Amino acid sequence: MSHWLGVYKISNEEEGIICAKKIMSLKENLFLLQEYCSGHDFRIVVLGDKVIQAYERVPFQIIGNGYDTIETILKQKVASFQLAGRDKSVDSSDSRIAKNIARQGYTLQSVLDPGVVCRLQDIANLSLGGPTADKTADISSYYQHLAIKIAQSLNLKLCGIDIIAQDITNPDNKDYTILEINSAPGLDNYVYEGQQQDNYVKRLYSMVFDFLEKM
């Protein structure tokens, strides 16, 4: 399924049954169950023998301002995504959003105090509204070498390696889980955040093209 449609974090048997029925309604006859791995979600992009990008993917969340309801802030967020040309798979009526709001003791009509964070998705993904936090300048040598070794073992010149870890900037933190290796990683995760980030994405693609020309 694309854009994380039909992907759910299940906390108990009852939720599992509900989610299974939702997936079946999408005419899917195959279920993939995966063990939940705790930690933060990172992607490390390798080009040749170098890490050119590393960032943390944060689940979609909103921050209270003391006067707007969760529903109002959510709709404003979705509207801003669409105005910027960001993927429209961010849907304010997504049942997973309602579940997360309720899990934290709120409703759509709740007004959060200024600075209070309400997580709306469990999944840390750009297509579901999640922001990113750049770690390229801070990733530890341990995780750089790990990512490069993985890419080389698969004979991939360009790839994105998805890792769950507590902190890829801490060289002493070596507890991690490899989620996925993507042989065609997108590099435009910052492009919606401003002109400076847009220029950064263009530089990344220039690096890739220069590398390919020299092969």
Describe the role of every protein-language-model region.
Residues 1-95, 140-145:
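Active-site nucleotide/adenylate-binding loops and adjacent lid/helix of ATP-dependent enzymes
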Residues 3-8, 53-55, 97, 101, ...:
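Generic hydrophobic/packing signal
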Residues 26-27, 78-169:
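A long amphipathic alpha-helix within ATP-dependent nucleotide-binding catalytic cores
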Residues 34, 161, 179:
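Active-site flanking residues adjacent to catalytic metal/cofactor-binding acidic residues
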Residues 47-49, 58-62, 67-70, 163, ...:
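Generic preference for flexible, low-structure residues
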Residues 132-141, 152-156, 165-215:
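C-terminal active-site "lid" helix and adjoining low-complexity regulatory extension at the edge
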